[in-house]
């Protein structure tokens, strides 16, 4: 889905992957398609977001490892570091259902859950951010 965004007009994509095996697989696939619009980073996402200097993103895909409580940290970092803006959209996969209460506790923006589903043990949703 993230790489597919290139074919749908995304100007640039950042992929942050800590697992070296997954990183190498992604790198190999990106080399096959020859995309120069993807920045692939092999690092812990929390550490990377803490130092990232970038304008706010329009679209963000979050698929953190389950049972590690990373999602609240990432959402807070995105808000604090101004890496999101009103009208940003965030796609989230998690082991628990994302609620507006959860989002309100972990994001400085008004959040609207546009779509949500469950497949097996995975919940996923698309949210749109509103004004702070």
Where are these regions (language model features)?
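Class I S-adenosyl-L-methionine-dependent methyltransferase catalytic core
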Residues: 1-132
């Amino acid at each position: 889905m993230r790489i597919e965004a290139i074919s749908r007009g995304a100007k640039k994509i950042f992929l942050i992957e800590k697992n070296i095996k997954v990183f190498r697989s992604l790198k190999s696939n990106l080399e096959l398609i020859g995309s120069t619009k993807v920045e692939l980073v092999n690092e812990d996402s929390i550490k990377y977001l803490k130092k990232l200097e970038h304008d706010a993103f329009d679209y963000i895909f979050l698929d953190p490892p389950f049972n590690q409580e990373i999602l609240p940290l990432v959402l807070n970092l995105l808000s604090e570091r101004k890496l999101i803006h009103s009208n940003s959209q965030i796609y989230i996969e998690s082991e628990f259902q994302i609620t507006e209460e959860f989002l309100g506790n972990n994001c400085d923006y008004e959040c609207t859950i546009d779509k949500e589903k469950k497949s097996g043990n995975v919940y996923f949703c698309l949210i749109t951010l509103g004004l702070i």
